[in-house]
Structures are given as C-alpha cells and as structure tokens.
C-alpha cells in the first residue's frame, strides 16, 4: 500500500511521462517492491545465507535475468542470485536471447498468465503453455 505522498509522486511522474510521449502508464499490482533498490538489504541477507552453500558445476545452461546472458561459472551463481533481488529484470532481453538460441516453446508454471502475455508481445511465433495445476503438469510431461 502506498502512502498518499508516494501515490501523488507516481501520478506526477506518470503525467510527465505522458506529456513526454508515453502512450500510457500502468501501475502494477504487486505485493512488494521486488527487483528494486528498496530490497538491497534483503539481497545482502541472501548473500550472507548463501555463503555456506556449495554451488557445483553448471550442467544445464541457464540465463540470468540480471544480464540476459548465460551463467558461465558456479562462482557467478551466488552473485547473480543476490543481485536479482534488487536489480531490474531483463525479461525481454532474456526471452529474445533464448529464441535466438533456438527455444520455441515456453512453459509458465504457477497461477496467472502474466508472463505468457509478455511472451506473446515479444514474439507471437513461439508456443506458450500455462500450467497451474499438478494434473496439467503431469499431462504436459507425459505427452
């Protein structure tokens, strides 16, 4: 929940952006300031917790949303996890990279279809599957 002062600041910023040419400004309905500088302290706590965790060699290539690039070494994993808490998500760049590297089917697991909607805006040619129930997951895996 935003304070009245913060709400007014957001309204002022949205109006300025629209005057500058933005087509629209949409407030997001989120439960916290995820992936923002406001969570830097949480990232530091995560870094402390990860100190005792051993990261093994990477066997399955994956892309971090911090850089929209592949994680190349186990030494980078903890740093990227910590940064992800308070860094912007490079979702579009990550998806574009995966598509460029041959991915043509994406699965969104969990409630809602937000990411699937973003996917369709990025590239309508890829297949997007939504799974929000265990039965749907089992059906997808056993197809």
Language model segments and positions:
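Acyl-group transfer acyltransferase/transacylase scaffold of fatty acid/polyketide systems
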Residues: 1-143
């Amino acid at each position: 929940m935003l304070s009245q002062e913060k709400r007014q600041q957001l309204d002022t910023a949205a109006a300025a952006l629209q005057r500058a040419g933005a087509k629209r400004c949409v407030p997001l309905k989120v439960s916290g300031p995820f992936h923002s500088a406001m969570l830097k302290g949480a990232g530091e706590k995560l870094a402390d917790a990860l100190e005792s965790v051993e990261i093994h060699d990477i066997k399955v290539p994956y892309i971090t949303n911090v850089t929209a690039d592949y994680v190349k070494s186990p030494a980078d994993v903890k740093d990227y996890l910590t940064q992800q808490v308070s860094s912007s998500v490079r979702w579009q760049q990550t998806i574009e990279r995966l598509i460029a590297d041959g991915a043509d089917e994406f699965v969104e697991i969990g409630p809602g279809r937000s990411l699937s909607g973003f996917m369709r805006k990025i590239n309508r040619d890829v297949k997007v599957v939504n799974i929000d129930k265990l039965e749907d997951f089992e059906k997808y895996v056993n197809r």
